[in-house]
Amino acid sequence: MISKPDKNKLRQKRHTRVRGKISGTTETPRLNVFRSNTNIYAQVIDDVTGTTLASASSLKLTGTKTEQAAEVGKLVAEAAKAKGVEEVVFDRGGYLYHGRVAALATAAREAGLKF
């Protein structure tokens, strides 16, 4: 019997492959996105020191999932700019650049982050 491929395992493989090629530095940290079934999380990470500089999530937000993602993008961009971060490397976490991930990225760009 043919078994259905586990989408999350495939996503994790993509994410691991991409993480081997990109990393955040102190000057240009990494904007990481995690998307669950109900929420979306974003954090700005300095991979050299292994610290999270800014983060935001949709845990307490209301509206559609896409609207929540856009609000998270705006919030994480504002938090990053408050820490002095202007430019980041976007890490979509193995997810397709579509829907909620694209909405988060667009809102972060509009709020002033460069990537």
From Swiss-Prot:
One of its GO terms (molecular function) is structural constituent of ribosome. One of its GO terms (biological process) is translation. Disulfide bonds: none annotated. CDD domains: Ribosomal_L18_L5e. Pfam families: Ribosomal_L18p. It comes from the Bacteria. Residues 10-20 have a biased composition (Basic residues). NCBIfam families: L18_bact (TIGR00060). This is Large ribosomal subunit protein uL18. The gene is rplR.
